[in-house]
Structures are given as structure tokens and as C-alpha cells.
């Protein structure tokens, strides 16, 4: 059975994607090829990941038709603006070896935490994405790491509502205000870092749930995202864990357990925030 989420424009996305950021040093292509062998068809990359060529090569060498894949890329924050975004889109397509993308995102809403012109830059960048979408070069457009005030800037000044917003989301860091806002606007949330960091994997309640449901802690995290209506983008360099991370449709987390997961104290935050310099732990 094929599990998908459906965007507001009717485009379907495989319900679990494969995150490719820092998959492993110098072995991106092998890892992505293995992910494809394990059944992943939704691959998430970005110009900043410096692995679009590896993703494209793995897709081509898989022997699976391009249209069976869902490819996402993103414009980096130092290339915001109308003309530079159009050029960056073409560069990403060239590196990926494709003439279209399934989803293209603005990676971050601000070039830096000190940049005061981000509102106008975001609007110019979004208008470039709108034109790419209207010209059918991309099947869906969206943003990443946008909070409600960043989104409102676009909603008030442009014509197409973002279809996707990628956010850090995992037990212990669910960004409820941003997620609720996106749901109200019909914006699909995708979760980067859906498994969180080491502290999440060692959280006693999550370990207790893993034993209760006879799955891994990572599977609990991924299933939690899905039951919240969030599309997870786990990453792994292990074939076994790749398989486990896809094997999350044979159980449901009970309601009371979901409530406890949603109200965990903050753990595992990456330190990344769109309006602040990164917090180092």
C-alpha cells in the first residue's frame, strides 16, 4: 500500500521521505542508492547540502522512472531575490539531472539574523517560485523554517499560499504555534530531524513506548509525526534503520501516549532558529 499526503493543489507526496543532509561524509551517492533500494521514493535535498549531483545520479542509476520519484530542493538563504532564485532553480535541476522538480522551497526566511530587508527579499523570492510553478517547472512550492510572522508576510503580499513548510519537529520540540498556524492555512508540515538528537533517543518515556509497542525509539518518533499530520524526513546511513524508519504503518500510538508525547519538556532542539544566531550546545 502506498501511503501519501495530499497538498492543497492535489499533488501527492510519499508519506515518509528520506533526508539527505550530511547523510555521511563522501558517501552520499551510496547511501541514497541504498535508500532507494529500501523503498524510498521521496528524496529531500538542497543546494546547501552539496549533494544534488549524488541524488540525481542515484535516481538515474536506480533504473526506476523519474516520475516515480518525488524530488525536493531548496534555494539557500544567501541567494534570496527574484533573479537569483530563478538561476538557483535551474542550477539545482542541472545538478539533479532533471527538467522539473516536484517541490521547491525557500530554505530559510532570512539571510542572517541581522538582515532587516528579509520581508522584501522573501516576497521577491516567493514571486520567483510562483512563476516557476505557473510555468510548470515545479509541481509544488513551499518554504522551510518559516514561522507565522514570516508566512504572514507572504500571505499578505503574494497570490499563492505555500503548500509546504519544513520545520524541525520531534518529541520534545513540536513548535505547536507554527504547526497549528500552518494547518489553519492548509500548509503541509514536513519534519526535518523527526527523530531529534541523542537526548531524544534516550528519553525514558520514549524508551518505555518503544518497548510497549515493540518498535525502535526512532519508529515511535516517526509514527508520532505521522499521527500529528506531519510528514517526516528521517535520515540514516544504516540499511536496517532505513528499513525500520519506513516500517511505521503497522501500529498506532494510543491517544494518552500521544498526549504525553505532545507535552514532553523541551529536549533535542538543534539550536537552529530563523530569527536568531544558532544556539550552540
Spans of model-derived segments:
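CE4/NodB-like, metal-dependent polysaccharide N-deacetylase domain
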Residues: 85-106, 131-135
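Short, acidic/polar
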Residues: 24-35, 81-96, 149-151, 174
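Residues at the N-termini of beta-strands
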Residues: 42, 100-103, 140, 164
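Acidic-and-aromatic substrate-binding clefts and catalytic sites of carbohydrate-active enzymes
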Residues: 23-26, 44-54, 78-83, 112, ...
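N-terminal binding-site loop/beta-alpha segment at the start of enzyme catalytic domains
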Residues: 1-69, 196, 281
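Acidic (Asp/Glu)-rich catalytic clusters
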Residues: 8, 56-66, 93-98, 155-158, ...
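A short, structured active-site edge motif that brings together acidic residues
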Residues: 66-79, 103-109, 166-169
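Beta/alpha (TIM)-barrel catalytic core signal, keyed to glycine-rich beta->alpha loops juxtaposed to Asp/Glu
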Residues: 109-281
Amino acid at each position: 500500500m502506498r501511503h501519501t499526503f495530499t497538498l492543497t493543489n492535489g499533488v501527492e507526496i510519499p508519506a515518509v521521505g528520506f533526508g539527505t543532509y550530511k547523510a555521511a561524509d563522501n558517501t552520499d551517492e551510496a547511501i541514497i542508492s541504498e535508500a532507494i533500494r529500501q523503498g524510498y521514493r521521496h528524496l529531500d535535498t538542497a543546494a546547501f547540502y552539496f549533494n544534488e549531483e549524488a541524488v540525481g545520479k542515484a535516481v538515474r542509476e536506480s533504473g526506476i522512472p523519474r516520475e516515480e520519484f518525488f524530488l525536493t530542493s531548496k534555494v539557500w538563504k544567501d541567494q534570496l531575490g527574484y533573479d537569483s532564485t530563478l538561476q538557483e532553480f535551474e542550477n539545482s535541476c542541472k545538478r539533479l539531472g532533471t527538467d522539473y522538480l516536484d517541490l521547491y522551497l525557500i530554505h530559510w526566511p532570512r539571510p542572517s539574523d541581522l538582515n532587516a530587508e528579509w520581508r522584501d527579499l522573501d516576497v521577491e523570492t516567493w514571486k520567483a517560485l510562483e512563476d516557476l510553478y505557473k510555468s510548470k517547472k515545479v509541481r509544488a512550492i513551499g518554504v522551510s523554517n518559516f514561522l507565522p510572522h514570516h508566512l504572514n508576510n507572504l500571505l499578505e503580499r503574494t497570490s499563492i499560499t505555500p503548500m509546504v513548510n519544513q520545520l524541525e519537529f520531534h518529541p520534545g520540540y513540536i513548535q505547536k504555534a507554527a504547526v497549528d498556524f500552518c494547518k489553519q492555512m492548509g500548509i503541509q508540515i514536513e519534519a526535518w530531524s523527526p527523530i531529534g538528537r541523542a537526548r531524544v533517543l534516550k528519553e525514558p518515556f520514549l524508551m518505555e513506548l518503544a518497548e510497549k509497542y515493540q518498535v525502535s525509539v526512532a519508529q515511535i518518533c516517526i509514527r508520532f509525526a505521522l499521527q500529528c499530520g506531519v510528514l517526516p524526513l528521517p535520515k540514516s546511513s544504516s540499511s536496517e534503520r532505513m528499513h525500520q524508519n519506513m516500517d511505521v504503518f503497522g501500529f498506532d500510538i494510543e491517544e494518552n501516549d500521544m498526549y504525553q508525547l505532545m507535552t514532553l519538556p523541551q529536549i533535542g532542539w538543534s539550536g537552529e532558529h530563523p530569527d536568531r544566531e544558532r544556539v550552540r550546545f
